[in-house]
């Protein structure tokens, strides 16, 4: 057997056994054989405000980052960049971060920090859902922001819709007839249901992100804090808010998502 294959297997076996005693604060592992997810997975992506991805990039424990390369996407540019702080976590267009901590080692974070063309969203969703299935995860938690047609005074700070699992919070769920104008989320929801992946959708009200750091005006600041409050209440994960709030959304135009409308039913 090829010795390189043996070494790769040994490397990933050491990751599964949480053998991180000599690991730096953050380390990049190339995308190659052996990609996997731990039992509980958080996913944040570039939706209308990129609040979920910015919330996760502030993780304040040691991580190992894996480049989730999808050749069909071609060259991908980063959407969010740190504006005022130096980050220990490397920024990649699509990455998996395994938490390197003896107490919270069962978590992986997936961050999509690039804009996905509507015609390519199914490629990314398929890769992620297949990884979830192959890794036999216990739960996928998706952090997303949606522009909701609900009067401002009646908006909740966070909603939760579940698929194939129980709720994690007492937050209200969005009605079954809620329309979602988000190509990636549409495809992800369908694939999650098709493959029976236990999934919790944590949804914060949102608007198109400004070309700036998170602000109250586009609701990205409130969404990031709502996500952190939820995660902190369910897990022992901690985040550096200064890092999250320094991540500048790098597009001059608001993101628009094409795609079929999908209901939460």
Question: What is each of the regions a protein language model found here?
Answer:
Residues 39-40, 107-108, 139, 160, ...:
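Functionally constrained cores in energy, signaling, and assembly domains
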């Amino acid at each position: 057997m090829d010795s390189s294959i043996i070494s790769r297997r040994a490397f990933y076996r050491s990751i599964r056994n949480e053998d991180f005693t000599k690991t730096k604060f953050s380390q990049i592992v190339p995308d190659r054989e052996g990609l996997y997810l731990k039992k509980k997975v958080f996913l944040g992506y570039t939706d209308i405000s990129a609040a979920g991805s910015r919330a996760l990039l502030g993780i304040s424990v040691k991580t190992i980052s894996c480049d989730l390369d999808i050749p069909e996407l071609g060259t991908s540019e980063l959407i969010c960049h740190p504006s005022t702080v130096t980050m220990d976590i490397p920024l990649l267009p699509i990455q998996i971060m395994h938490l390197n901590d003896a107490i919270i080692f069962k978590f992986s974070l997936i961050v999509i920090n690039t804009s996905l063309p509507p015609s390519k969203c199914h490629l990314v969703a398929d890769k992620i859902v297949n990884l979830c299935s192959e890794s036999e995860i216990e739960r996928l938690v998706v952090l997303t922001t949606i522009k909701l047609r609900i009067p401002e005074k009646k908006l909740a700070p966070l909603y939760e819709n579940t698929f194939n699992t129980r709720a994690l919070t007492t937050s209200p769920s969005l009605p079954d007839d809620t329309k979602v104008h988000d190509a990636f989320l549409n495809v992800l929801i369908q694939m999650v249901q098709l493959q029976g992946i236990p999934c919790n959708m944590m949804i914060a009200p949102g608007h198109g992100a400004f070309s700036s750091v998170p602000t109250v005006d586009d609701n990205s600041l409130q969404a990031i804090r709502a996500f952190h409050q939820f995660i902190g209440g369910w897990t022992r994960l901690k985040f550096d808010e200064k890092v999250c709030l320094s991540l500048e959304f790098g597009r001059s135009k608001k993101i628009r998502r094409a795609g079929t409308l999908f209901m939460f039913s």
